[in-house]
Design a protein with these regions (language model features):
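Membrane-interface "cap" regions at the ends of multi-pass membrane proteins
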Residues: 1-29, 58-63, 67-79, 85-86, ...
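Membrane-embedded translocation segments of transport machinery
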Residues: 2-8, 12, 168-328, 332, ...
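Loop-to-transmembrane helix boundary motifs in multi-pass membrane proteins
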Residues: 7, 13-14, 21, 137-142, ...
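Helix-loop-helix connectors at the membrane interface of multi-pass transporters/channels
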Residues: 1-2, 106-135, 246-252, 257, ...
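C-terminal membrane-solvent junction of multi-pass transporters and transport-like membrane proteins
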Residues: 87-90, 346-358, 394-451
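Inter-helical loop and helix-membrane interface segments of multi-pass membrane transporters/permeases
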Residues: 2-5, 34-38, 71-90, 103-162, ...
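Membrane-water interface regions at transmembrane-helix termini and the short interhelical loops
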Residues: 34-38, 64, 79-80, 86-95, ...
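Transmembrane helix-boundary motif of multi-pass solute transporters/channels
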Residues: 10-48, 241, 257-260, 264-267
Length: 463
């Protein structure tokens, strides 16, 4: 396989692109829900500890492997150990599956942004609005194809001219928008029909204060698993994306600083997402108002925006534009990972590869978008939930494949290649790898056990 010609221009371009991949829709619709459900500040403390230990280990491994091998997932694992090429193939299949539905979610968000731009905030707050939209045989497909087209156009233009250029302005704007909405949420105040007055500041304290009431060993372990799964999925590890992005990093870039900056950006945005959503929902709906996933973003929050009056339309616009940026940056990285692997496998050029993949995923996105209408199915998943086409793809890729891949990769690096394979790359230019001892312990002993537990829990084997 030929060495890659594409690369990021420097550390800033890489960090912003990688942070864009890590900052996805999960930061907006899952992190706040888990924080509210799992004891507020208690969840935040556990999450931060995991990011600095467990997340750091997996993120460091993926990026270092990518730069050392100068290959995407399939080529990278084959170069490390030819017999482990199968792990590269498994890793490649994760974004292949995710790409079938990520543009659909991006399309939903784009639809809501249009709704707020056109002054239909009150209509979006109606109970049946979201269900009516996703069960339509036309509208979800149109918006999914639009989102997929924008994603493909950016990837088509390459690493520097496409991905890096977009990330350099989109991620700072996203950060500013999140901060603005979070600050506004703290100023909110509302008195409900029963005469109870709640403020945004009270909601913020509810978010920050560790709630240990009724905490048992079983409850603590559940919070730990929730925080671990959120952190794991948030950092874009074990899906080949960071291996691909790592392969674009120049030799003189300090990976130690880069990993730290990616962690800080992703965790910071997740924290601010909680700060902008939890206080707002608390003010208008109390502690019972937090939903998870699509119900939070497309049902609960529109009701909150409607309750804000005229200001709600403007806040809704800012929020859904923020969500578009978060989803688009992740969608770009998913398609880029697939593109890079296909370019290596078939020795094809970028533009031809992207055009073919675009045709495939335009069709796939349309099918998944119609999974709530024409192609509606209900399948009981092993974790006990009932899912449609989108949920099935998400379950297979996120709950089954990613933890399993992470488990195998920690065993490969920790026991077959040995941790020095990654450590040598982290110290390539004479840099001091400060968390070297922590990395050795995590990659060999702690991470494999944690990934096994997460795999058993996410597949429903361990309740």
């Amino acid at each position: 396989m030929e060495k890659k010609a594409n690369h990021f221009s420097g550390q800033l371009g890489f960090v912003l692109a990688a942070a864009g991949s890590a900052v996805g829709v999960g930061n907006l619709w899952r992190f706040p829900y888990l924080a509210a459900k799992d004891g507020g500040g208690l969840f935040l403390i556990i999450y931060l500890v995991l990011v600095l230990t467990f997340g750091f280990t997996l993120l460091t491994s993926d990026i270092a492997i990518g730069r050392r091998t100068k290959q995407s997932a399939i080529g990278a694992y084959e170069k490390m150990r030819p017999k482990w090429k199968f792990l590269g193939i498994l890793t490649f299949l994760v974004p292949v599956l995710i790409m079938t539905y990520y543009a659909v979610i991006g399309g939903w968000i784009t639809k809501y942004a249009v709704v707020y731009f056109t002054g239909q905030a009150q209509a979006a707050a109606e109970d049946s609005y979201f269900t009516t939209f996703i069960t339509s045989p036309v509208s979800p497909v149109v918006f999914a194809l639009l989102f997929m087209g924008v994603t493909a156009f950016i990837v088509y233009n390459g690493v520097q001219d496409g991905i890096e250029n977009v990330s350099k302005w989109m991620m700072p704007v996203l950060l500013v928008l999140v901060v603005v909405i979070a600050v506004y949420s703290l100023t909110l105040k509302h008195t409900d029909a029963s005469g109870i007055t709640r403020t945004g500041w009270q909601g913020f304290l509810y978010y920050l204060t560790p709630n240990c009431e009724g905490l048992s060993v079983q409850r603590f372990l559940q919070i730990l698993l929730d925080a671990m799964s959120q952190m794991f999925f948030s950092l874009s590890v074990s899906m080949g994306i960071m291996i691909t992005y790592g392969s674009y990093v120049k030799p003189d870039v300090d990976l130690n600083k880069a990993v730290n900056q990616i962690e800080i950006f992703d965790t910071g945005v997740a924290f601010l997402a909680g700060a902008m959503i939890i206080p707002a929902v608390y003010v208008f709906s109390g502690t019972e108002g937090m939903g998870a996933g699509p119900s939070l973003m497309f049902v609960s929050l529109p009701k909150v925006f409607a309750a804000m009056g005229k200001a709600g339309t403007f806040v809704g616009i800012l929020f859904f534009v923020t969500a578009i940026f978060a989803t688009l940056s992740s969608c770009i990285s998913v398609l880029e990972s697939i593109t890079a692997n296909c370019m290596e496998i078939f020795h094809a050029g970028r533009r031809k590869t992207v055009l073919i993949l675009s045709a495939i995923y335009l069709a796939a996105s349309a099918i998944i978008a119609l999974g709530y209408s024409i192609f509606y199915v209900e399948v009981k998943l092993p974790n006990g939930s009932v899912g449609q086409l989108l949920d099935i793809m998400d379950y297979i890729s996120n709950s089954v494949m990613m933890p399993f891949i992470a488990l195998l990769s920690t065993l490969l690096i920790g026991w077959i290649m040995t941790p020095d394979y990654v450590i040598d790359e982290m110290e390539r230019n004479g840099e001091h790898f400060r968390r070297k001892k922590l990395y050795r312990v995590m990659i060999r002993y702690v991470a494999p056990v944690m990934m096994l537990v997460l795999f058993l829990q996410s597949t429903g084997i361990l309740s």
